[in-house]
Amino acid sequence: MRLEIENGLEFVNDPVVNELGKICFFHPFTGNLTNKLSFRSHFNRYSFYAINYPGHGNSVINNPKQLEFSYWLEITKQFFDKHNLKDVILFGHSIGGGLAVALTNYLSSDQYKAVLLEAPLNPAIVETPLNIVQNLIPDPDSDFAVIQKCLVYNIEKKLGANFKEYCEREKQKSIHQNQRLKVMLEPSTLKQNIVLINAAFLKLNCPALWIHGKQDGIIKYLPSKAYYESLNNKQIQFKAIEAAAHTPYFEQPQKFLSLVNDFFQLIS
């Protein structure tokens, strides 16, 4: 799989012969499309597409408007049109999950087939303490260990004596690499994004699988489940994974892949 750059945006356009389907991946906040290379390896008979949005991977930020959700929706629509993508499974993690849902209100109905969500941004984010959300990009005096525990279940036990050093290293990396993204964590910005995501959830009319870690400290499980139940949409399956926080694919890959395999068989 080859990463390309065009007009400052890094992307993957990787069709396969005799494909079983098409997957477009939408990365999480401060993540990038390489986060799911192992997922793509598992589903290697599917064509794979993805964009690194401005400020992520090797995609550049030319102006602040490129960090707006509406801009991400627009360039994704252009990407789909340029590559003539049809019947795509929209797969998103965290903010990428919110983007995947919002796109169902933005793409034409023949451009997408189903939605796969991993701990997606949804209106339940209001139940997460604001200091947790805003410290996803830390300040020098932030306790980044708290954030790591929200992201990965039992991470302190998993890393043992290396935990403190790991947190400091990740903190410094984020401070140096991600500061320009911090505007995306402002309450007013999140509110605008949630309005778009909620509107799309309310109208969602394609099969969807929503996978959420029960110990998620970023987008909490119980409020997310309550929001899902309020939708009363039989097209959406909601599946919880134990011993997983905000990254269930990496924390419990076999359970995650089993759920996805079943879903892909259902929609094939």
From Swiss-Prot:
Q: What terms describe the molecular function in GO for this protein?
A: carboxylic ester hydrolase activity; lipase activity
What keywords does the record list, in alphabetical order? Hydrolase, Serine esterase
Q: Where is the active site?
A: H27, S94 (charge relay system)
EC number(s) recorded for this UniProt protein: 3.1.-.-
Gene3D superfamilies noted in UniProt: alpha/beta hydrolase
Q: What class of enzyme is it?
A: hydrolase
Q: Name one GO cellular component term.
A: membrane
Which superkingdom is the protein from? Bacteria
Kindly indicate whether the keyword Metal-binding belongs to this entry: no
Q: Which Pfam families match?
A: Hydrolase_4
The record's similarity note reads: Belongs to the lipase/esterase LIP3/BchO family.
The name this protein goes by in its record: Putative esterase/lipase 1
Q: To which species is this protein native? A: Mycoplasma genitalium (strain ATCC 33530 / DSM 19775 / NCTC 10195 / G37) (Mycoplasmoides genitalium)
